[in-house]
Amino acid sequence: METTKKLFALLCLFVTMNQAISVSDPDDMETFCMKSSRNTTSNTTYNKNLNTLLSTLSNQSSFANYYNLTTGLASDTVHGMFLCTGDVNRTTCNACVKNATIEIAKNCTNHREAIIYNVDCMVRYSDKFFLTTLETNPSYWWSSNDLIPKSFGKFGQRLSDKMGEVIVRSSLLSSSFTPYYLMDTTRFDNLYDLESIVQCTPDLDPRNCTTCLKLALQELTECCGNQVWAFIYTPNCMVSFDTYNSSLPPLPPPSRSGSFSHRGNNKLLGGMVLAVSVSVFAFLSLV
C-alpha cells in the first residue's frame, strides 16, 4: 500500500514537472510578448491587420524560407517576418511557420509586438519598423545536458575559433539563395566531428550580420561551451553547434530535452530539466 502511494505521488510529480517546463507546446516554441504602452484589443483595425499579416506569412512559408511584409496605415501598421533555418525543406518550414503564427496569436493576444522561436523557424511582428535594424534581445538558447568528454581538451577555444571562421565566411553570402546561411563540418578528433551552423535574417547588411553572430556566439559559449550541442536564437540571427561520433549512425535533430533559457525579460528557465532529473532520481531512491 505504501509503495502504491509513492508511485502515485511520483506520477503526480512527473505531471507537475512536465507542466513546469512546458513552453508554448505543442511544438517546443517559446513566445515573447513585448510590453507596450499601446496594447490593442481584439476588434481593432490593428488586430485585423495583424491577423491578415500572420495568415500571409503562413501561406508564404510554402514558397520561401524568409519573407517580410507590412500591412495597414499610420498607427494601425503592422510589420512582420518569418525565417526558417537553411537546412529545413519547404514542408518543414511551412509546418513550423504555420504553427508559430497560431501560437503567437494565441499567446500574445492584444500585444502590438511579439516574437516566437522554434529550432526550425522564428516569426515576428511589431507596430514599429524593425527590418535592417540589428537587435539582440530577446535571445533564447537550448543545450544538451551532456558535457563534452575531457579527452577533447580545450574544446571551448577550438569551438570559438571554428565558429569565428564560419561567421566570417557567412558574411560573404548576402546574395546567396539562402542569405548568410552556412553549415560547416570539421573533424576535430579521431572519431568526432563538429558541425557549426550560422544564419542571419536577409534584411541585415553583412556588417550587422557579423556583429549579430559574434554576440550570439559569445552568449552561447558562455552558457553552453562545454555541452555536446547548443543552439541560440536572437531576433536577427541564430548560431548552433553539435558534436557527434562520425562512425555511428546520425542521431535525430536535437529536441529541447536539455537545458534552456532566455534573455530579454524576467523569465529564466535554464537548468530546470537538470533539476527535474535530480529530483526524480532522489524520489525514486525513496520508493
Curated annotation (Swiss-Prot):
Q: Which CDD domains match?
A: Gnk2-like (cd23509)
Residue spans crossing the bilayer: 268-286
Spell out which residues lie on the membrane's Extracellular side. 21-267
Q: In what way does this protein cross or attach to the membrane?
A: Single-pass type I membrane protein
GO CC annotation terms, alphabetical = plasma membrane
Where it mainly occurs, coarsely classed, is membrane
The residues forming the signal peptide are 1-20
Subcellular compartments: Membrane
Cross-referenced Gene3D superfamilies, in alphabetical order?
Answer: Gnk2 domain, C-X8-C-X2-C motif
Which stretches face the Cytoplasmic side?
A: 287
Task: Give the UniProt keywords, A-Z.
Answer: Glycoprotein, Membrane, Repeat, Signal, Transmembrane, Transmembrane helix
Glycan attachment residues as annotated in the record: 39, 43, 59, 68, 89, 99, 107, 208, 245
Tell me which residues make up the Gnk2-homologous domain.
Answer: 28-130, 135-246
Q: Name one Pfam family in it.
A: Stress-antifung
Q: Which PANTHER family does this entry report, sorted A to Z? A: CYSTEINE-RICH REPEAT SECRETORY PROTEIN, CYSTEINE-RICH REPEAT SECRETORY PROTEIN 57-RELATED
In the record, the note on similarity to other proteins reads: Belongs to the cysteine-rich repeat secretory protein family.
* Record's protein name: Cysteine-rich repeat secretory protein 58
In which organism is this protein found? Arabidopsis thaliana
